């Protein structure tokens, strides 16, 4: 999806993104 690289590191991808 549209998640920052640091966030989509090991997350599902559609999970809530946390601003790094």
UniProtKB/Swiss-Prot annotation:
Gene responsible for this protein: ferA
Protein's name according to its UniProt entry: Ferric reductase A
Keyword annotations of the record: Electron transport, Flavoprotein, FMN, NAD, Oxidoreductase, Transport
GO molecular function: ferric-chelate reductase (NADH) activity
Catalysed transformations (reactions): 2 a Fe(II)-siderophore + NAD(+) + H(+) = 2 a Fe(III)-siderophore + NADH
Enzyme class name: oxidoreductase
UniProt function note: Reductase activity that acts on Fe(3+)-chelates and NADH as an electron donor and requires the presence of FMN for full activity. May play a role in iron uptake.
Induction: By Fe(3+) ion deprivation.
Summary of subunit composition and partner proteins: Monomer.
EC number assigned by the record: 1.16.1.7
């Amino acid at each position: 999806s549209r998640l920052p690289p640091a966030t989509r590191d090991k997350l599902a991808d559609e999970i809530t993104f946390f601003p790094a």
